[in-house]
């Protein structure tokens, strides 16, 4: 299985996402929208930040359950309601997600399907073929473009 983050040098570079992700071989896991709910199904208190953090933790638990980590995620889709801002969601989510620059779509929506939910995150994950171990997803920067090194401060969020 090969997962290649595609970031042409002629396009904006961001350490938190890739412009595209190419998946060769393997299997795909589609993770449905995860809201910020606890183990009993109740929405975590505190608003967008805690909900985003919990949604990421749930994604990571699913990834661990199938034997991979965030580096195997080919694409994320993040939904947040009109009642919160991207800043409310992004910081807490990135703290838990880390710098795994996958392809991402972020949508502000009127509302989510569950009352009280203000954040939802979905993922498409590249899994190794059955019976084969997970491979290293890192390819030379000459193949996929570059993103700023992790030690650089993150760029401001787009407005």
Residues covered by each model-derived region:
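N-terminal presequence-like segments and the immediate start of the first folded domain
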Residues: 1-57, 61-74, 80-159
């Amino acid at each position: 299985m090969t997962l290649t983050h595609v970031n042409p040098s002629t396009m904006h570079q961001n350490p938190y996402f890739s412009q595209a992700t190419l998946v060769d071989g393997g299997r795909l896991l589609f993770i449905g929208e995860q809201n910020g709910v606890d183990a009993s199904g109740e929405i975590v208190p505190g608003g967008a930040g805690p909900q985003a953090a919990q949604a990421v933790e749930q994604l990571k638990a699913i990834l661990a359950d199938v034997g991979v980590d965030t580096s195997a995620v080919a694409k994320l889709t993040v939904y947040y309601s009109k009642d919160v801002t991207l800043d409310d969601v992004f910081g807490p989510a990135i703290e838990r997600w880390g710098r795994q620059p996958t392809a991402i779509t972020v949508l502000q929506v009127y509302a989510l399907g569950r009352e009280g939910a203000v954040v939802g995150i979905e993922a498409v994950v590249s899994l190794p073929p059955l019976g084969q171990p997970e491979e290293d997803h890192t390819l030379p920067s000459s193949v996929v473009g570059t993103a700023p090194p992790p030690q650089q401060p993150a760029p401001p969020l787009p407005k």
